[in-house]
C-alpha cells in the first residue's frame, strides 16, 4: 500500500484537476447559453427568406435558378462542420461516422464526393482518408462571423454552378437540448422543397408587385438564404460543442470527486495502519523492558 504522504499528494493533484474541470464546465455553460440566444435570433430570418423564395420562385414564370433545378447526381459536395478543440465527448466522432456512412451509401450508387471542411478536427480527420478537399477553414472561435464562412461555402457553390458537382450537402451537429446533439447530413443545393411550400400555395391566392423583377430578387434571396443556412448550422454546431463539453467536464468533475473520496479512504487506512504499527512497537518495547 502506498504511504500516507504519497496518497496525500495524489489527493492534492486530483483536487487541482477538479478545480480546472469545474471551471471549464461553468465556462461552457455560459457560452452555450449565449450561443442559444444567437440560434434563436437567426432562425426567424432564415424561415422568412425561405417563405419569400417559395413565393417568388412560383411567380417567376419561365425562369429557374440553377440552385432550384434537379439534375442527375454523379458527384456530391459535402460541407462538414466540426470543432476546433477537443474535450467535447464523442461529438466529432459521431459526426464523422454519420458522414462516412452517408459517403459509403453514395459510393454504392456510383456517386463520388468532394469535401469542404470547417473546423480543425474535421480537417485532420478527413485528410487521412485522401478525400478531394475543395476548401477548408479553422479558427472560427465561439462567435463565428458569416464573412469568414463565405469563402469555403462559395467554393462549393461555384463548383455546383460550373457542373463539377451535382448537389451540395452540409454535415453538422444539430443542437436538440443540453443532453442531446444529433449529427445530421442535409441537402442545401438543389434547394429541397419545404413542407410549408404547399401550405403557402394553398393559402395565398394573391401576388406581390416585385421591385426589382422576380429574377433579380430570386438570385439575391437564394444566396442570402444559403448563407443563413450555413451560419445556422455553424451556430448549432458551436452550441452542441459547448453542451457536450459542459456534460463531459461535469462528468470529469464528478469522477474526480469520487476518486478523491476513494483516495481519502485509502489514506485513512494507511494512516490507521501506520498508527497501529507504532503502537505495536511501543507495546513490544515496553514488554522487553
Swiss-Prot record:
Membrane topology summary: Peripheral membrane protein
Cellular location(s): Cell inner membrane
GO terms (BP aspect): proton motive force-driven ATP synthesis; proton motive force-driven plasma membrane ATP synthesis
GO MF term (any one): proton-transporting ATP synthase activity, rotational mechanism
Keyword terms, alphabetized: ATP synthesis, Cell inner membrane, Cell membrane, CF(1), Hydrogen ion transport, Ion transport, Membrane, Transport
Chief location of this protein within or outside the cell: membrane
Pfam families: ATP-synt
Quaternary state and interactors: F-type ATPases have 2 components, CF(1) - the catalytic core - and CF(0) - the membrane proton channel. CF(1) has five subunits: alpha(3), beta(3), gamma(1), delta(1), epsilon(1). CF(0) has three main subunits: a, b and c.
Protein name (database record): ATP synthase gamma chain
Species: Haemophilus influenzae (strain ATCC 51907 / DSM 11121 / KW20 / Rd)
Amino acid at each position: 500500500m502506498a504511504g500516507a504522504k504519497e496518497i496525500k499528494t495524489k489527493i492534492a493533484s486530483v483536487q487541482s484537476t477538479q478545480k480546472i474541470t469545474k471551471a471549464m464546465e461553468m465556462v461552457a455553460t455560459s457560452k452555450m447559453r449565449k450561443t442559444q440566444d444567437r440560434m434563436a435570433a437567426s432562425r426567424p430570418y432564415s424561415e422568412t427568406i425561405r417563405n419569400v423564395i417559395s413565393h417568388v420562385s412560383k411567380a417567376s414564370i419561365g425562369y429557374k435558378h440553377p440552385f432550384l433545378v434537379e439534375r442527375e447526381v454523379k458527384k456530391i459536395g459535402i460541407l462538414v462542420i466540426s470543432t476546433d478543440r477537443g474535450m467535447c465527448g464523442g461529438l466529432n466522432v459521431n459526426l464523422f461516422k454519420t458522414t462516412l456512412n452517408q459517403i459509403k451509401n453514395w459510393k454504392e450508387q456510383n456517386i463520388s464526393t468532394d469535401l469542404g471542411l470547417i473546423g480543425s478536427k474535421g480537417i485532420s480527420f478527413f485528410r487521412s482518408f485522401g478525400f478531394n478537399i475543395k476548401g477548408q477553414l479553422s479558427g472560427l472561435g465561439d462567435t463565428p462571423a458569416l464573412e469568414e464562412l463565405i469563402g469555403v461555402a462559395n467554393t462549393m457553390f461555384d463548383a455546383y454552378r460550373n457542373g463539377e458537382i451535382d448537389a451540395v450537402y452540409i454535415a453538422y451537429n444539430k443542437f436538440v437540448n443540453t443532453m442531446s446533439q444529433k449529427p445530421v447530413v442535409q441537402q442545401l443545393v438543389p434547394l429541397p422543397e419545404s413542407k410549408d411550400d404547399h401550405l403557402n400555395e394553398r393559402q395565398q391566392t394573391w401576388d406581390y408587385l416585385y421591385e426589382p423583377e422576380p429574377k433579380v430578387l430570386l438570385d439575391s434571396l437564394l444566396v442570402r438564404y444559403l448563407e443563413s443556412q450555413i451560419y445556422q448550422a455553424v451556430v448549432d454546431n458551436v452550441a452542441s460543442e459547448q453542451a457536450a463539453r459542459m456534460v463531459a467536464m461535469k462528468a470529469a468533475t464528478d469522477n474526480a470527486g469520487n476518486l478523491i473520496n476513494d483516495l481519502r479512504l485509502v489514506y485513512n487506512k494507511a494512516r490507521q495502519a501506520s498508527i497501529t504499527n507504532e503502537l505495536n512497537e511501543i507495546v513490544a518495547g515496553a514488554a522487553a523492558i
